[in-house]
Amino acid sequence: MSGFKQHTGLVVPLDTANIDTDAIIPKQFLQKVNRIGFGKHLFHDWRFLDDAGEQPNPEFVMNAPRYQGATVLLARENFGCGSSREHAPWSLADYGIQVMIAPSFADIFYGNSINNQMVPVRLTESEVDEIFQFVEANEGAEVTVDLEAMLVTANNKQYSFEIDEFRRHCLLNGLDNIGLTLQHADKISEYEAKIPSFLK
């Protein structure tokens, strides 16, 4: 995986609190165990008027022409609550979302997002309010997220955010759990060479 340093992208504002993982990716789409192909089912029950996903809901914000191609999702508090399904960040990433900005995220969803190389940015409610106002008032509004400096820039204003150093290291260097393990491949091989043959 390539690391995340900085990203500038179009923002889609999802002005709803407590969005759970069942809304992000409904349970009927959880049959697969790889990460590809879930984007078309993202927010299925909100994006579409039919079960087959062929009739877009014109009232849902992500279907608006001005937000097509958005890579930054702006949301309200407690985003990603509910069950711990990793399919939720898979669907967001497959749709093209690289950054999520909200006042808070559910803990498991927050960790799963980082494992899937998406950056969940926590700002204060008032800061999120300001960005909502900027995005809704300006078609094509973009924000820049700088993970190295831990800054969000929107409407020529900067907002600082915090992320623990270990998770920041993983994102900057494109490391998931497997990548972290492979960093110690030489030590693992050295240990395995010392294991008595009858234990192998």
UniProtKB/Swiss-Prot annotation:
GO terms for cellular component: 3-isopropylmalate dehydratase complex. It catalyses: (2R,3S)-3-isopropylmalate = (2S)-2-isopropylmalate. Gene3D superfamilies: Aconitase, domain 4. The keyword Amino-acid biosynthesis applies. Keywords: Amino-acid biosynthesis, Branched-chain amino acid biosynthesis, Leucine biosynthesis, Lyase. Pathway: Amino-acid biosynthesis; L-leucine biosynthesis; L-leucine from 3-methyl-2-oxobutanoate: step 2/4. One of its GO terms (biological process) is L-leucine biosynthetic process. InterPro entries: 3-IsopropMal_deHydase_ssu (IPR004431), Aconitase/3IPM_dehydase_swvl (IPR015928), AconitaseA/IPMdHydase_ssu_swvl (IPR000573), IPMI_Swivel (IPR033940), LeuD (IPR050075). One of its GO terms (molecular function) is 3-isopropylmalate dehydratase activity. Disulfide bonds: none annotated. It is an enzyme of class 4 (lyase). It comes from the Bacteria. Its EC number is 4.2.1.33. NCBIfam families: leuD (TIGR00171), PRK01641.1 (NF002458). PANTHER family: 3-ISOPROPYLMALATE DEHYDRATASE SMALL SUBUNIT, 3-ISOPROPYLMALATE DEHYDRATASE SMALL SUBUNIT 2-RELATED-RELATED. Catalyzes the isomerization between 2-isopropylmalate and 3-isopropylmalate, via the formation of 2-isopropylmaleate. Belongs to the LeuD family. LeuD type 1 subfamily. Heterodimer of LeuC and LeuD. This is 3-isopropylmalate dehydratase small subunit. It comes from Aliivibrio fischeri (strain ATCC 700601 / ES114). The lineage of its organism: Bacteria, Pseudomonadati, Pseudomonadota, Gammaproteobacteria, Vibrionales.
